[in-house]
Amino acid sequence: MADSLPTEFDVVIVGTGLPESILAAACSRSGQRVLHVDSKSYYGGNWASFSFSGLLSWLKDYQQICIDGEESTVKWPDLIHETEEAITLRKKDETIQHMEIFCYVSQDLDDNVEEIGALQKNLSTVASSTLTEPLDSACLVKDKRSVYVTKYKMPAKDTLKSDRETSLEVNDIEETLEKENDCGDKTRVHTDGDKDEKPVEDNMDQPKRNRITYSQILKEGRRFNIDLVSKLLYSQGLLIDLLIKSNVSRYAEFKNVTRILTFWEGKVEQVPCSRADVFNSKELTMVEKRMLMKFFTFCTDFEQHPDEYEAFKQRPFSDYLKTKKLTPSLQHFVLHSIAMTSESSCTTIDGLKATKNFLQCLGWFGNTPFLFPLYGQGEISQCFCRMCAVFGGIYCLRRKVQCLVVDKESGRCNAVIDHLGQRIHAKNFIVEDSYLSEETCSSVQYKQISRAVLITDQSILKTDSDQQISVLIVPPVEPGTFAVRVTELCSSTMTCMKDTYLVHLTCSSSKTAREDLESVVKKLFTPYAEIEINKEEHSKPRLLWALYFNMRDSSGISRSSYNGLPSNVYVCSGPDCGVGNEHAVKQAETLFREIFPSEEFCPSPPNPEDIILDGNDKQPEVPGTKNVLMAEVEP
Amino acid sequence: MSMEDYDFLFKIVLIGNAGVGKTCLVRRFTQGLFPPGQGATIGVDFMIKTVEINGEKVKLQIWDTAGQERFRSITQSYYRSANALILTYDITCEESFRCLPEWLREIEQYASNKVITVLVGNKIDLAERREVSQQRAEEFSEAQDMYYLETSAKESDNVEKLFLDLACRLISEARQNTLVNNVSSPLPGEGKSISYLTCCNFN
Ligand SMILES: Cc1cc2nc3c(=O)[nH]c(=O)nc-3n(C[C@H](O)[C@H](O)[C@H](O)COP(=O)(O)OP(=O)(O)OC[C@H]3O[C@@H](n4cnc5c(N)ncnc54)[C@H](O)[C@@H]3O)c2cc1C
Ligand SMILES: Nc1nc2c(ncn2[C@@H]2O[C@H](COP(=O)(O)OP(=O)(O)O)[C@@H](O)[C@H]2O)c(=O)[nH]1
Ligand SMILES: [Mg+2]
């Protein structure tokens, strides 16, 4: 593996987040020689997804004090010529702050946990009571990191046994079978006759609560794919368009978000967002149903009826809704869950547009306007990286760039020097914001994103199916704070272990993540306790584990805010706070057009199935076999 | 999908150190040739070959690493919906054998646990330069519960056998699966693929 990097490229890209990865694919696709590096050992930067143990390692890395260029064999100053100057890059990522971890489940030691690549149990020493103190972040650093288990198991179907009863899966969506899950369909049958198999719970009104321990979470840790940034794909959004157009979609699979929820009068309710939903809703009265239908019908072609909203055009959408004979709860639905706007900021015209957009996004893939990528958001940037590699791009994780080398005379950057002291030449350089030094960013004003990641035992709105993917917007309570977006993922999204839910909370920061989000967490969940004390709390899902952190939001920073960057160095931002990925796609496309004005942005690659293979034993491919569903078996 | 002229479709993924002959194995099998010189085939994501096994058409979609293994930077998504993995090393290169545990760790982490893994020792035409004995490899593969085969992409030794045996095994696994589940279980693509086709089906 002592393979050294080639040293001549057209484009060097530093950082593997979504915008950089889209750009990498676009550049490589248009014939540029691309080198794509990341200083981390994983893809995605702040767009990454981690297994549970991976997330713990990530947290630990952030808490370590910067080890100053330990690995650099040759320091850059020795490698810079007289005619050049260097712009140093940051040694340590500083985009994550205020991390706080809470573990509510018991950390019993009887289970012999053995997870490959995992930090072992007793990682953190949190009390398993309801009285949880924030884990002092220094705690994690002190923890002993046990040796990796170096025994390799054959990934055979029966290595792990389903150790819980299987709950009934009454499901109205087609593909909720968890094929890959150990506790999934196949193993389920295998264990049917097992003695320890408890009877199947058939009373859905009183869902059985499983006792889940920390060691179980660790053991099943690879079932988790925990997104650092929680996003969804609009079914008619730019990212879906790009994925389809570029054929990158073949590397990923998606599920529909199944429900849009709302928090109204202290209760979580489902928002009826399609005509069918409105009809079938049990929460709505006949009168409400009629009002909502009428309003939806109007919204789908509101431009045709200017007289109906002209007077309100620039006034708040919330005021306008009051005039539309909608009950307060319906107004709330439309404002927060459908238009997804916050009370004060949205004008009527924008609200109508958003509502229309929402209605148009419905029904393309399912009942809500959103899709979620299986295995998490982190897959998406990797898919673009694969496309880049397929067209010859070279990939190198764990490669740190010490500095950009600028030619004094031309003022252009002509190379980078990596941590091994290797000089790599290129014509253009794309660098993600978090790699730029404090000096370069000294006049930049960053926003922050507040994030929480929760592992829970039940859905915030229980129904027949335990495999729902839900989005809930909780409006701000106090002025000056922001609406909180809650995304609840079930295990069939391949992001959490069976019998748990992975819940992401996201908002623009006004304080630390915990300060911003804890009140919403408390409204929706109750801490896990072995014995139920409070009957009233019984119906709420229980919190097994929680993490809070703040992430820097470098979106929307104008290029001129960065000091002293040569004109052929382009900057990509980290994740923004919005639901969709439009910002990343727009940024990638804008930069691509700036660098290569005459090139097409991510055109469709030739279909591998159309590449007719030479040789005598070839089987002619039948035309019309495009758009094959990946790896589908048709018995 | 009903128009497709095959009975089964499987995704097979190759992994192993750079230079062990993965690309050559794929091209030998799908194109029947041993490419002169090195260099990946730019723009080719995967190769397809349809084979007939006991009267059934089996379409094999064979994915190569796109060179990302060179600096240990394979994307996890590469493993995601593979039905089978071909883990390759070079019998004339001890190092490529010693790296196998690392590859197995990746498989364990990212591949489905129903994936079938085959260990392949390639370049047996260079027997005089062998560094890894057959016995060592057999012991290793047994311990890991993998199938094992030695091949030469150059001389076309065992290459057909490798893929055809794998196809047979995949068919019987898939059969077992559908029997047990009593539903037509798509394997392993549990999600939706998005394409224009899907879009047009709605509304
Ligand atoms: C069905 C539906 C589809 C939507 N589709 C998209 C979409 O494809 N892309 C999207 O970004 N937002 C879309 N929105 C709007 C989006 O949900 C919210 O406006 C946005 O998430 C508000 O977040 P914010 O207040 O945190 O961000 P803001 O600070 O209000 O905006 C964040 C960024 O998003 C951009 N943006 C906001 N609204 C839109 C929009 N409608 N279209 C394009 N860009 C917008 C802005 O330019 C801004 O840079 C859609 C809304 C609905 C209901
Ligand atoms: N002698 C011999 N050389 C081989 C064989 N297979 C591949 N090679 C050579 O090994 C080198 C690397 O092969 P390649 O398929 O590119 O390896 P990859 O990096 O694993 O895809 C090339 O020079 C091939 O010609 C083989 O079976 N026998
Ligand atoms: Mg190759």
From Swiss-Prot, chain B:
Keywords: Cytoplasm, Cytoplasmic vesicle, Golgi apparatus, GTP-binding, Hydrolase, Lipoprotein, Lysosome, Magnesium, Membrane, Metal-binding, Methylation, Nucleotide-binding, Prenylation
Family: Belongs to the small GTPase superfamily. Rab family.
Effect of residue 23 to N: Constitutively inactive (GDP-bound) mutant. Decreased colocalization with group A Streptococcus-containing autophagosome-like vacuoles
Removed propeptide positions: 201-203
Function as written in the Swiss-Prot or TrEMBL entry: The small GTPases Rab are key regulators of intracellular membrane trafficking, from the formation of transport vesicles to their fusion with membranes. Rabs cycle between an inactive GDP-bound form and an active GTP-bound form that is able to recruit to membranes different sets of downstream effectors directly responsible for vesicle formation, movement, tethering and fusion. RAB30 is required for maintaining the structural integrity of the Golgi apparatus, possibly by mediating interactions with cytoplasmic scaffolding proteins.
Protein name (Swiss-Prot/TrEMBL): Ras-related protein Rab-30
Residue numbers binding Mg(2+): 23, 41, 64
Result after altering residue 68 to L: Constitutively active (GTP-bound) mutant. Increased colocalization with group A Streptococcus-containing autophagosome-like vacuoles
UniProt-annotated stretches for the region Switch-I: 36-44
Organism encoding this protein: Homo sapiens
GO cellular component assignments: cis-Golgi network; Golgi cisterna; Golgi membrane; Golgi stack; intracellular membrane-bounded organelle; trans-Golgi network
Gene Ontology biological process terms in this record: Golgi organization; Rab protein signal transduction; vesicle-mediated transport
GO molecular function: GTP binding; GTPase activity
Classification via InterPro entries: P-loop_NTPase, Rab, Rab30, Small_GTP-bd, Small_GTPase
The record's note on its domains: Switch I, switch II and the interswitch regions are characteristic of Rab GTPases and mediate the interactions with Rab downstream effectors. The switch regions undergo conformational changes upon nucleotide binding which drive interaction with specific sets of effector proteins, with most effectors only binding to GTP-bound Rab.
Catalysed reactions, semicolon-separated: GTP + H2O = GDP + phosphate + H(+)
Lipidation residue positions, type S-geranylgeranyl cysteine: 199-200
Cofactor names: Mg(2+)
Regions annotated as coiled coil: none
Residues given in the record as GTP binding sites: 20-24, 41, 67, 122-123, 125, 153-154
List of residues that carry Cysteine methyl ester: 200
Known EC number: 3.6.5.2
Gene3D superfamilies, alphabetized: P-loop containing nucleotide triphosphate hydrolases
Regulation: Regulated by guanine nucleotide exchange factors (GEFs) which promote the exchange of bound GDP for free GTP. Regulated by GTPase activating proteins (GAPs) which increase the GTP hydrolysis activity. Inhibited by GDP dissociation inhibitors (GDIs).
Bilayer topology annotation: Lipid-anchor
